[in-house]
């Protein structure tokens, strides 16, 4: 899964560049440092994004609360919009704000494909290119 996650991050960085954003994978994200770093940092001089990237072949994904907390801390300091970018197999990228996620009894977060499609935004909406009404 790490291999697919890294590939997903690289693919998303490429897509962000194509949308006119300078974008990079954050070095040492994912636990190699104590600093709260997202997987991807991107900006175009007007909009700044901090993105925690997840890829999955399933229709449900779980995210550690520590990752969401770090994303929110970084975004607050940096002045970025925090997003979780999720690539479900055979689907385009879906972006959600941390508030769109469901808290589990163990204080982590869960996201089902149906909820992601209902609440999520596409890449154009996140980058300010148009307003998405729904992904379904």
UniProtKB/Swiss-Prot annotation:
Positions annotated to bind Mg(2+): 9, 39, 52
The record ties this protein, via Pfam families, to:
Hjc
Q: What Enzyme Commission number does this protein have? A: 3.1.21.10
GO molecular function terms noted in the UniProt entry: crossover junction DNA endonuclease activity; DNA binding; magnesium ion binding
Q: Which residues form a coiled coil?
A: none
| Superkingdom per UniProt | Archaea
The protein's annotated catalytic reaction(s) are:
Endonucleolytic cleavage at a junction such as a reciprocal single-stranded crossover between two homologous DNA duplexes (Holliday junction)
CDD domains according to UniProt: Holliday_junction_resolvase (cd00523)
Is Nuclease among the key words of this record? yes
Q: How does activity depend on temperature?
A: Optimum temperature is 55 degrees Celsius.
Q: How does activity depend on pH?
A: Optimum pH is 7.8-9.5.
Active-site residues per Swiss-Prot or TrEMBL entry: 29
Subunit description:
Homodimer.
Protein name as it appears in the record:
Crossover junction endodeoxyribonuclease Hjc
């Amino acid at each position: 899964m790490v291999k697919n996650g890294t590939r997903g991050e690289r693919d998303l960085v490429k897509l962000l560049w194509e949308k006119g954003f300078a974008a990079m994978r954050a070095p040492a994200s994912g636990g190699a440092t104590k600093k709260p770093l997202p997987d991807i940092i991107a900006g175009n001089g007007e909009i700044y994004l901090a993105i925690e990237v997840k890829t999955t072949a399933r229709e449900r994904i779980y995210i550690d609360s520590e990752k969401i907390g770090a994303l929110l801390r970084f975004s607050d300091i940096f002045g970025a919009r925090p997003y979780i970018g999720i690539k479900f197999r055979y689907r385009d990228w879906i972006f959600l704000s941390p508030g769109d996620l469901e808290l589990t009894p163990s204080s982590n977060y869960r996201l089902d494909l149906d909820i992601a499609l209902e609440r999520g935004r596409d890449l154009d909406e996140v980058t300010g290119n148009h307003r998405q009404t729904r992904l379904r």
